[in-house]
Amino acid sequence: YLGVVSENLNEITGQVMSKFEDYLQRHKTDAVIVVDDLASTMAAAIVTKKQGLILAHLAAGTRSFDITMPKEINRLVIDGLSDILFTAGISNNAVANREGAELSKVYMVGNILIDNIRNNHARFTRPQILAEQGIKDGEYIVFTLNRKALMAARENLQRMLEAIITAAGNTPIIAPLHTKAADTVTQLLPKDATRFLITAPM
């Protein structure tokens, strides 16, 4: 929407801050709701507060407690700046409260990912790979991978893949992966992992 193009998180942050500031200056706004914990979310949150506007964070209070993860840094910054925290559950409320958020600014609204799945369930189509491989509904495992840190820790990832394949037994594993993740997984898979099926994102 803002026309930001980059794979570098710091460049994304800078571009979003610049373009979102321009957007807010051209459009009268009282409050901004930011969603999730991406670099663009953090950038929009910072700009919102610098403009003196009300900031609400949807999916607040989520923590991995691993400060080496870029998203964890984003979460801490966004929640720290927010005037209103919309959380997914009681455990998220507890995190927000432990970090000093006033009870009056924390609202448990549920998990928007689950809400989206329920609301769009009728639009889902049966993945083509099921028919191609003769796989019955409900008789498969889905595997996905998008964390750069996990892809970089190749030995850990390889052990994880081996453990998943062993635990799955004869149950097929369908892995909808983006190109980079697919390349990494392909390099690390055991040669006899014939039931591990990589496909394009669905």
Residue ranges and their predicted role:
Residues 1-102:
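Active-site and donor-binding regions of nucleotide-sugar-utilizing enzymes
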Residues 3-4, 81-155:
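A nucleotide-sugar donor-handling region in carbohydrate enzymes
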Residues 11, 15, 73, 91, ...:
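Conserved active-site and cofactor/substrate-binding residues in soluble primary-metabolism enzymes
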Residues 35, 57-59, 109, 144, ...:
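Short beta-strand segments
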Residues 43, 95, 116, 183-185:
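Phosphate- and divalent-cation-binding pockets in alpha/beta enzyme and binding domains
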Residues 54, 105, 172-173:
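Residues at the starts of beta-strands that form the adenosine-phosphate
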Residues 60-64, 111, 200-202:
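Short, acidic/turn-prone active-site loops that include or flank metal/cofactor-
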Residues 125-202:
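Donor-nucleotide binding loops and adjacent catalytic segments primarily
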